[in-house]
C-alpha cells in the first residue's frame, strides 16, 4: 500500500490542445520527487487520433476538429458531458506495469458503475469498459520515462451522435452508450467525485488532496 498522496484537479471545460500540451509539459518537467496528479475535466467537441490510428476509421468528421495525438489506441471522440480523467502518475514509483495500470483504471470504472447498479465488464482484447456489449468508457495512455499521461473517458450525459462519424477505437459499428441512457439524468460533478475516490483506492494512494488552480502553469 502506498503511503503518499495524489493531487486531484477538477478543471471544468478545457480545450483539448491546451490540456494535451499541459500534460506533456507536466510529464517532461517532473522529477523523482514530483507528486502524482489526476485531472478531471471535459472537452469541447474533438476527435483525437492515437498513434496507431488509421485514417479509414475517421469516416466523416464534418465540422468537428481532428487532433493527432501521442497516446496509444485509435480514434475516439470527446465532448461536453463526457468525464475525462488524465492520470499523471509515476508508475515506476507505484511499482506497477502498464497492463496492471490499465486493469486498475478499468476496475475503478466498473466499481463506479456498480454504485449506480450498472453491471459493466472489461475485455482483455479491447481496453475499455462495456455494458451489454456497448462501450461506455475508453482508455488511452502514454508512458514516458516511467510516467503516465492521457487516461480515460467516461460517457455520462452527452451527445453520442459524433461517435457514428468514426469507427470508435478502430471497431466498425461499435455501439456506444452512456450513464444517462442507463439510469436517467445524472450530475457529472457527482460522477467525478465518485470516480476520483475509486481511482485513489485502486491505485493505492494513502489519501487525495484537492489542488487549487488550473493548468496555466503547465501550458
Curated annotation (Swiss-Prot):
UniProt keyword Acyltransferase present: yes
Site residues, Lowers pKa of active site Cys: 135
Enzyme class, UniProt record, top EC level: transferase
Pathway: Protein modification; protein lipoylation via endogenous pathway; protein N(6)-(lipoyl)lysine from octanoyl-[acyl-carrier-protein]: step 1/2
InterPro entries named in the record: aa-tRNA-synth_II/BPL/LPL (IPR045864), BPL_LPL_catalytic (IPR004143), Octanoyltransferase (IPR000544), Octanoyltransferase_CS (IPR020605)
GO biological process: protein modification process
Amino-acid positions noted as binding substrate in the UniProt annotation, renumbered to this chain: 71-78, 138-140, 151-153
Molecular functions per Gene Ontology: lipoyl(octanoyl) transferase activity
Reaction equations catalysed: octanoyl-[ACP] + L-lysyl-[protein] = N(6)-octanoyl-L-lysyl-[protein] + holo-[ACP] + H(+)
Domain annotation BPL/LPL catalytic: ranges: 32-207
Active-site residues (renumbered): 169 (acyl-thioester intermediate)
EC number(s) per entry: 2.3.1.181
Classification lineage: Bacteria, Pseudomonadati, Pseudomonadota, Gammaproteobacteria, Pseudomonadales
More info: In the reaction, the free carboxyl group of octanoic acid is attached via an amide linkage to the epsilon-amino group of a specific lysine residue of lipoyl domains of lipoate-dependent enzymes.
Chain segments annotated as coiled-coil in the UniProt record: none
Keyword Secreted on entry: no
Role: Catalyzes the transfer of endogenously produced octanoic acid from octanoyl-acyl-carrier-protein onto the lipoyl domains of lipoate-dependent enzymes. Lipoyl-ACP can also act as a substrate although octanoyl-ACP is likely to be the physiological substrate.
Cross-referenced PROSITE patterns: BPL_LPL_CATALYTIC (PS51733), LIPB (PS01313)
Primary residence: cytoplasm
Organism for this UniProt entry: Stutzerimonas stutzeri (strain A1501) (Pseudomonas stutzeri)
Entry's Gene Ontology cellular component terms: cytoplasm
Compartments it resides in: Cytoplasm
Protein name per the record: Octanoyltransferase
Family statement: Belongs to the LipB family.
